[in-house]
Amino acid sequence: MIEQARKLYKQAQADYPALKAQIEAQVVRWFWASGGMGLFSLEPFYFEQNHFSKAKILKKAPKNVDNKYQYGVNDKDEIIVVRNYLKLKGIIKGQYWEKFYFREENQIISYYFDHSAKKECANVKIFTYKDGLLQHIYAAFKEHYWEETMYYEGDKLIRRETKGVDNCSDPINDFLLYTYDTSGELNSITSGTGYVIYQKKGKKV
């Protein structure tokens, strides 16, 4: 599967016009959000792990799109397109990064394209599921790639292993551990070296 992700990445830029047309044809509604680092991620505990705040949904389209997010949803009310209007040096006003989510029964393929006119692909990721639970993430970038495997107790993610090759051709071999409080909410995320990445406020590992 990682080879499939790498293959899709290599042809992604050339496929961009067709991918964009195909996914946007499925959009039935658009909405906007502001602040934070977006509204959602397919990656488990993305906001907690990175200490990001979430964006807030806007009631109507903003007059100024700088640092705003635009979302396209399909007829199942699933997000399938994300546009991120970052205000950064070198980015022309109105340009945006964009993600496409091609959703299938037990798999989602995401494409992440940059803001440039060339629309270079930043990464391609394949998310696989079983009984509604994420099983693997296969990620391909320009010079590196990795595969992540999820382990559960019941429906609670307890371990996430990452193996691959970094952009210096060195091996990647790491894992994250997840703990939960008595109410079932995430309590902590710890790296393979024991470093506490996330700790719920008021709790101790």
What are these regions (language model features)?
Residues 1-205:
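Buried hydrophobic residues that stabilize the cores of well-folded domains
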